[in-house]
Design a protein with these regions (language model features):
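Membrane-interfacial amphipathic helices and adjacent loop/beta segments
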Residues: 1-16
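Non-catalytic C-terminal accessory region of glycerolipid acyltransferases
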Residues: 16-147
Length: 147
């Protein structure tokens, strides 16, 4: 995967370096696209937002929205479709050009709805092993983890 992802000049950023590196890219006026692969469940200490996703109470990652709002960066959803083995098309859908003007969690909710449409269109294309629902919200505010 590393060779595929770096073949055309792209590079990965470690999760713990994301904010610093993206701020540096913006400060240096580096023309770039930052892509978040955000279809996995958040870690236990990052359960900030819950929504109904595929008819399940689900925690959704909020990091991409928080970074977009902090740096006022446009948000684009990439809808990937497999044409045939090894060939894909990508449709870009503008979520917002002005994240600071949107209500809190609006971007995250739009992401959840767009991702849900993609999955319902082609369920076999989603990697179901991400354990999307391993965390359960409990009314008392405590967290129950299912294995």
């Amino acid at each position: 995967f590393f060779n595929l992802r770096t073949k055309f000049g792209s590079f990965g950023i470690k999760k713990q370096d994301t904010v610093r590196d993206v701020i540096t890219l913006k400060k240096d006026k580096t023309r770039c696209v930052v892509i978040f692969i955000a279809d996995q469940t958040p870690s236990r200490n990052n359960l900030h937002y819950w929504t109904n996703f595929l008819n399940q109470d689900s925690s959704i990652l909020t990091g991409p929205e928080r970074l977009a709002r902090k740096l006022d960066l446009p948000v684009i959803f990439l809808d990937t479709k497999q044409v045939k083995r090894g060939y894909y098309t990508i449709d870009m859908k503008l979520v917002t050009e002005t994240p600071k003007e949107t209500p809190e969690n609006w971007i995250t909710e739009q992401y959840a709805r767009l991702m849900e449409k993609c999955i319902l269109r082609n369920p076999s294309g989603w990697l179901w092993t991400h354990k999307r629902w391993k965390h359960k919200r409990v009314e008392s505010g405590e967290l129950r983890v299912e294995s």
